[in-house]
Amino acid sequence: MDSKKKSSAEAEGSKERGLVHVWQAGSFSLTPERLPGWGGKTVLQAALGVKHGVLLTEDGEVYSFGTLPWKSEAAEICPSSPLLESALVGHHVVTVATGSFHSGAVTESGVVYMWGENAAGQCAVANQQYVSEPSPVSISDSETSPLLAVRILQLACGEEHTLALSISREIWAWGTGCQLGLITTTFPVTKPQKVEHLAGRVVLQVACGAFHSLALVQCLPPQDLKPVPERCNQCSQLLITMTDKEDHVIISDSHCCPLGVTLSESQAEKHASTVTSPHPETLDGQGEVFENTVAEAELNMGSDQTTSGSAISAQQNIVGMAEVSSARTAPSYPDTQTVTAYLQKLSEHSVKENHEREEKLPQVQPLVEEAVPDLHSPPTTSTSALNSLVVSCASAVGVRVAATYEAGALSLKKVMNFYSTAPCEPGAPSGTASTGPESLKDLREEQVKQESLQGKKSSSLMDIREEESEGGSRRLSLPGLLSQVSPRLLRKAARVKTRTVVLTPTYSGEADALLPSLRTEVWTWGKGKEGQLGHGDVLPRLQPLCVKCLDGKEVIHLEAGGSHSLALTAKSQVYSWGSNTFGQLGHSEFPTTVPRLSKVSSESGVWSVAAGHGYSLFLVDTEDFQPGLYYSGRQDRAEGDTLPENPSGTTTPVLLSCSKLGYISRVTAGKDSYLALVDKNIMGYIASLHELATTERRFYSKLSEIKSQILRPLLSLEHLGTVTTVQLLQEVASRFSKLCYLIGQHGASLSSYLQGMKEARNLVIMKHSSLFLDSYTEYCTSVSNFLVMGGSQLLAKPAIDFLNKNQELLQDLSEVNDENTQLMEILNALFFLPIRRLHNYAKVLLKLATCFEVTSPEYQKLQDSSSCYESLALHLGKKRKEAEYTLSFWKTFPGKMTDSLRKPERRLLCESSNRALSLQHAGRFSVNWFILFNDALVHAQFSTHHVFPLATLWAEPLSEETGGVNGLKITTPEEQFTLISSTPQEKTKWLRAISQAVDQALRGTSDFPLYGGSSTVQRQEPPISRSAKYTFYKDTRLKDATYDGRWLSGKPHGRGVLKWPDGKVYSGTFRNGLEDGYGEYRIPNKALNKEDHYVGHWKEGKMCGQGVYSYASGEVFEGCFQDNMRHGHGLLRSGKLTSSSPSMFIGQWVMDKKAGYGVFDDITRGEKYMGMWQDDACQGNGVVVTQFGLYYEGNFHLNKMMGNGVLLSEDDTIYEGEFSDDWTLCGKGTLTMPNGDYIEGYFSGEWGSGIKITGTYFKPSLYESDKDRPKAFRKLGNLAVAADEKWRAVFDECWRQLGCESPGQGEVWKAWDNIAVALTTNRRQHKDSPEILSRSQTQTLESLEYIPQHVGAFSVEKYDDIKKYLIKACDTPLHPLGRLVETLVAVYRMTYVGVGANRRLLQEAVKEIKSYLKRIFQLVRFLFPELPEEGSTVPLSAPLPTGRRSFCTGKSDSRSESPEPGYVVTSSGLLLPVLLPRLYPPLFMLYALDNDREEDIYWECVLRLNKQPDIALLGFLGVQRKFWPATLSILGESKKVLPSTKDACFASAVECLQQISTTFTPSDKLKVIQQTFEEISQSVLASLQEDFLWSMDDLFPVFLYVVLRARIRNLGSEVHLIEDLMDPYLQHGEQGIMFTTLKACYYQIQREKLN
């Protein structure tokens, strides 16, 4: 607040604002009085009741004055000076309100305080006559849980009620009477209740008369309109009524709820249709009881009138008042033209009918006098009721229409009789009506006229046809009884030739949030005896009802007097309705029950209003911007008046003399007095604000006039010109409408601003200047585009005729004074007229700035804003000149080229017609014309031309050595040429022009000045690297392809998307114009109606590196590419399991063909081939296994088994010899039976289908050892591919990634550089993929970016560092080593899973792992040269920990008998922990299959022996008794071992050994075995209580017991895996002996027999 005061003081001097002047109502005293006893505090707001008033000061204090009977102390009842309401001190009140005898205030925290008379509960206090001091009112929303206090924004008070508007824009009411809008019969209402009928709508303002209420509500956006229910939500009556007549059916959809609930236009949206039904539908309710019994008496309803559907409809409309919806679509009639023609005949016939019926309807005079509205209002209640009585739904041809017409006439006669009982409106003269039939005819014509005007009501304010002209009163010459036919059909026929132009919706987001909405509705409720509700009748309403005729009138403020209402519009007009006894409505037209324009001043617009008891005040704009005050209403009785009971009033509003007072900012009206708040004009600040507000409101009126009188009629013409012309003009009109709406909103906000604190920093034009600057810029752009394309010269003859007829109007509106000016120039001046307003803004803001100190922030902001508007005005002026320059250029340009080059947004910058620029090396007679537009450089030659878009154009000056002084090099994606200028100055001019144009084209904007910044800051040179879109036309590979992405010096470079016309698309990175890096490529396959899809790496425009290619046929290849071909290691999946030939190949490719080692899985045949390939065929050594257990290894030729081979069947039958085809024996060989018998000789035939043998049968001697039997078994693997030859491509690829052409040949530093690059590149690519890296993965990648550095001698610590690095590297496929391991795991699983899970392949699988270890170890030693070779020893930096007990001696001794000299470096020790866990499942499965038979024997013995208790088993196994545990410690308790005890002895050792199955590597498994031995020693030591020495004879039975109790299912597989993969140096050490013991136990268990 301090800063606010300071700013105000600087601008104004001191305390010269908010002065209070009071007039007596009706006295017209020339000089108003200053409020008695009032000091000098600035008053922001005042409110007046019948005999009292309140003032709100700038510092948030409230003062009461007048008669205050509710005060407790006598001195305060009639205070001599305004009395401070001490109860409100410190609460900072922001708004006040008064009713007739009570007051209210709202604090800045949204709390309401009430005081004064409370007989009707209007102060929200129960059972209390008066509330002497302001007391807070509790308002809480019961719908929320817990109850939330409702914050209030505004307050309005009537005589017996109060309304509050909450911050969520809902109305809360309390007090007494129907004016509360609450559904209740219990009064008074002392607890504030929500007015539910308006819940969900945005209420902008509330106002209270004595006994009626008004609300200003924001219109619903179109999408918020909801579909219709079948019945009314409030009274449960049908929304569409149907009455079955003798020959037709009458349907009415104009339901109006008796509670005063009207339907929204869309809710009445039901098509009228022909219905023929023998059973008439009737409504339930015959009427509703009002709280006001007088209203019920006035209705005077007879029972006979409520029997027919038409009468029911009429009754409902009398009670509830609704209008036939005008937003409905026309029903689908069979033949609209027939109906239209028929209607014409019908209209001629009905004129005669009218004359014949003249005598029959003499009683309608009062009705017509009340109901005829002026042209501007939609139909009133009576007309609406009449119209909806008889809506015929005949099929609209022939007899049906005639029948409807006749029956309708009878219905209408009934209605007339019904209406004649309604009372005449009070105050309406009775002798001025014309004769009945003529009046009725006028009424029906008016109705049809209104229906057609409201025709297709758009919810957008920008519908050009929506706002009717406010002037003339033409009427259509259609007969009255045409209402028999559906009014929709009439509307449709009336607007057949009208162009529908719906322009930009006015919901502009930001502007609507910051400025008051003009899309408003007025809702009224309460008592309506004087017509103050505006519904065309005098009936009360229990609930809010929309005053439809104010829709689209842009009402921005409401005021309610004692029994009349005022609505102020954005166009500075006032609509008034209600009691006009004293002329308080400002006009003398009837009826006064509907809103009509007040005739305040023909020249001045009204910007503020106040309504008192019997009078109104209008604050108007004057020529010198000082507000003038008009008074309209009651006058006090003059001296000697003999008729005091007939008080007089004004016939027209009277201007009060108040110019000497100062600038009135607000007027307030009470009963007998009214007051004005006045500001003195110190330093011109107030005058400048009023000038801004007045000119803005006048500007809006001017724009509205242009829209309604020029644009709307122009756009509604049938033939405007070409499609382009219409589009351009519609764009102009749309932007114009948007600007117009913004100006209207701003004018309304300025009116509110003048009534407030008037702080400079809160001016919308300064605070949110971008709203205005953008709107003006958009509008100017659309007008300039229209002008460039020829402007008004494009318009067709009907448009030109219209403009010629209205030339005087055009001249007047465009402010062109010269009568000789051409029509086109006038139209251009009119379109550019709004731009002038920017200069006015700049001027007024500058004026305001001078009222402040130069150092103040206000001065700076106002100065900056003024500069913004001025610079934009100059800029838009420049844009207009550019448009005119471009237009004149097109007029001289050759016609054919104009059509192709002329575009609305294209502007000419410069051209070389004066030969200032020429093409280097051009022919002697060639003509080269260069034209620079804002979006392209055009090179024209004779009749041809070429367009170079600026976004993809690079210009640079040539150096003197290469091209002379005046050369300019122009580079485009497909052209490169040199331009020579005539002089160095010309060269500089062209270079600057081209560079500036390119820069603007790239930024996507013209050279608009930066808002709030300098407009001179220009980038001199456009960037060499940029984003742009281009379509190639020349390049053979890229012809007609479109590229959108990054460029560098004329070539695609960086990320981009390239699309070919045939549907091919590449999306990825480019380098020097070619695909290079990572990208995605799609190629449509029209034959299969699918597409090929490649995602992966590219090099120089070709697929190169890792990628995935998905073929349209369903095949998928994942692997390496080179020159668009599969080359290197890859996986090809063909088909799926459900398809005809599913298969999978993984292996090496050369030039798009399988070559080298690969594995082929033929899923259909159940065979897997593992061997060599050449030219897509199996060639060389290989192995085949089948799902039936057959195993073949040998030679292949052209996909067939050919040459030497070995074949094994599942039952161990072996053939070793020659083959000629798949599974076909042919030649010399040996067949060995499972029992060892064998046949040597010649074999021919297919295996499994009979083999022809010529040879010798051998039966081995019984004395031959078993070892000699399976000779072939020992030969297995000799004809398979050597392990080191497998997957060479995988390892070669890894070496290549490290920068080595062959294994081990390369620089280490270069390898590490490549690793860093790979990690960075892969991470960047991974960011674009949908998979998100976890935090741990990200940390792993970050740690891998550090290269391990090793200086000095190699140690165990360095060895551990390398081990840790390898574990991390192999964990991420983004690292070359990680990718290698991932690929090896994939190929290993692919080989040995499924059909490959064959026990014959175990040795191959083991060899393969050993080969992996050897080859990876070579890679690791290359990266870490200091790592010793295989089998070397690393000295220990610290001695072995002392105190470890040797299991052999059982003693604790620091001196080991065979101390390890150091740590042995082996490939398996380093790499198996990384590799084996990943390969373990398939490998262990092979071990299990291979040891299947002996495992079964072992397991059977284990299960059998484990049935015995511990003591029995120990005895059976021969364990010495001294080692038997006597007692056991279980959960801390010592328990004796009983004969029945089971699974208790050596339990810790058993548990330890069971963990062998959870480990992967042999070293880990050996550690488990070692730990088990130690646990056994500990257990024995605990029972013996003394040192002892193990001997193998003692140890073996105990360990055997532990192995049995451990119950390891696949112990044989575990033993064999350790044996195959353990480091050789461990075999003779301690762990080797322990392992041998375990192996002995395994074989011993198989031979144990239980006695």
From Swiss-Prot:
The gene is Als2. GO terms for biological process: axonogenesis; behavioral fear response; endosomal transport; in utero embryonic development; locomotory behavior; lysosomal transport; neuromuscular junction development; neuron projection morphogenesis. GO terms for cellular component: axon; centrosome; cytoplasm; cytosol; dendrite; dendritic spine; early endosome; glutamatergic synapse. MORN repeats lie at residues 1043-1065, 1066-1088, 1094-1116, 1117-1139, 1145-1167, 1169-1191, 1192-1214, 1215-1238. Gene3D superfamilies: Dbl homology (DH) domain, Histone H3 K4-specific methyltransferase SET7/9 N-terminal domain, Pleckstrin-homology domain (PH domain)/Phosphotyrosine-binding domain (PTB), Regulator of chromosome condensation 1/beta-lactamase-inhibitor protein II, VPS9 domain. The modification Phosphoserine is found at residues 459-460, 477, 486, 1329. GO terms for molecular function: GTPase activator activity; guanyl-nucleotide exchange factor activity; identical protein binding; protein homodimerization activity; protein serine/threonine kinase activator activity; small GTPase binding. This is Alsin. InterPro entries: Alsin_GEFs/MotNeuronReg, DBL_dom_sf, DH_dom, MORN, PH-like_dom_sf, RCC1/BLIP-II, Reg_chr_condens, VPS9. Keywords: Acetylation, Guanine-nucleotide releasing factor, Phosphoprotein, Repeat. The modification N6-acetyllysine is found at residue 527. Residues 684-879 form the DH domain. The keyword Phosphoprotein applies. May act as a GTPase regulator. Controls survival and growth of spinal motoneurons. The modification Phosphothreonine is found at residue 504. RCC1 repeats lie at residues 59-108, 109-167, 169-218, 519-570, 572-621. Residues 895-1001 form the PH domain. Residues 450-461 have a biased composition (Polar residues). Residues 444-476 are annotated as: Disordered. Residues 1507-1651 form the VPS9 domain. Forms a heteromeric complex with ALS2CL. Interacts with ALS2CL.
